[in-house]
Amino acid sequence: TGWIGGSDGTILKTSNTGSNWSPQTTNTTSPVYSLNFTNENTGWAVGYQGLIRYTTNGGTNWVNQTSPNSSWLYSVQFINSTTGYAAGTTGTILRTTNSGLNWLQQVTGIGDNMYGLHFPSPLTGYSVGTTGRIIKTTNGGLTIIEPIGNEVPADFSLKQNYPNPFNP
């Protein structure tokens, strides 16, 4: 099962690896930029001007959840059935710990648009944005670590490790 979002509130669902797509009723005309499902029934959609929609029946019905601001939301990821994150314009990172009943703004201290996020573990997460910006958290989004730099070294050198037992 898979879902895609698009303009005019479009959400499409496939149950046969993309051979056929069925439109879902979203009750919005706002663009949908990202979707994330924790199982085949429960998922979230985010998009234009703080759009957050939630389904518990595989996308048959979508209900509104309230965003704390009107930032455009470009990415959403839930790490379990209750804890999730959304990233958007002007450094917006939102966090919920109750399946989206309440979304709280996280302090990032940056103004760049954040276009993607990924949590490889419940506490460690990354978000990427404009100008190569990457930010990281190691405590589940409660605080953001100083943004990871985007500087590229001018040059580098690799020297022989002598004596090298693997390359006599």
Residue ranges and their predicted role:
Residues 41, 123, 156, 160-162:
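Solvent-exposed, flexible loop/coil residues
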